[in-house]
A protein has these predicted regions:
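Short active-site neighborhood of thiol/selenol oxidoreductases, capturing the structured segment around
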Residues: 63-84, 88
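Thiol-/selenol-based redox modules, centered on thioredoxin-like
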Residues: 152-196
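N-terminal "domain-start" segment that seeds a small globular fold
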Residues: 29-61
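Short loop/turn microsegments at loop-to-beta-strand junctions
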Residues: 45-46, 71, 158-160
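Bacterial N-terminal signal peptides
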Residues: 11-24
Length: 196
């Protein structure tokens, strides 16, 4: 009797573990990454007042094109290779956004001097905004909490992209949970084209 029950119990245990694993996988798949969770599509982006790489101050309205603005929130153009690669891709993609009435801008905690160096090195023609004390990053709820004050990375955001209409209303948010990955600009362009 004992030898008959043993394989049955083993099979039951394996089936139970398999069902548990499937349930766990389904539950994990249901949890989607929500970048900037305090800001939803349809919300107005908090007011922006920031200086660019030339020391010129910009508001959200001044940054916007006829149809809107693509605002890229980046970690650093000084030491983050993923941000630098994204910046280079943005330089290549800017004309496509301009053609549909969208301006582009980036925002980081980098100093104005660092942003000026980035402009010269990567030949940008759009505003690279300095977020003083990461005030906007904090207001948007995207401050990377992994770093403590005093760490050189303190003040960086979780990177992502806002597609804003010409009234500063969020029409799309694009981000990857892994900071090393960035949304493809073809997807950003599609989101911008959908703005009426």
């Amino acid at each position: 009797m004992k030898s008959f029950l043993q394989p049955l119990l083993s099979r039951s245990l394996l089936i139970g573990l398999f069902v548990f694993a499937l349930a766990s996988t389904a539950s994990a798949a249901d949890e989607t990454f929500n970048w900037a969770p305090s800001l939803n599509v349809g919300d107005a982006l908090p007011a922006i007042s920031a200086v660019d790489q030339d020391g010129n101050e910009h508001s959200l309205a001044q940054l916007s094109g006829e149809n809107g603005l693509i605002l890229i929130m980046s970690r650093s153009f000084d030491w983050c290779p993923f941000c630098i690669r994204q910046l280079q891709q943005l330089v290549e993609s800017e004309a496509q956004f301009n053609a549909i009435g969208f301006n582009v801008a980036t925002m980081t905690y980098d100093s104005v001097a660092t942003l000026k160096e980035a402009e010269e090195e990567y030949e940008t023609t759009f505003p690279l905004l300095h977020d003083e004390d990461s005030a906007h990053i904090k207001a948007m709820g995207i401050l990377n909490m992994q770093y403590e004050p005093g760490n050189r990375a303190y003040g960086i955001p979780y990177p992502g992209i806002f597609v804003l209409d010409n009234n500063g209303v969020i029409r799309a948010k694009l981000a990857e949970e892994d900071y090393r990955m960035r949304p493809d600009f073809s997807l950003v362009l599609e989101a911008a084209q959908a703005v009426e």
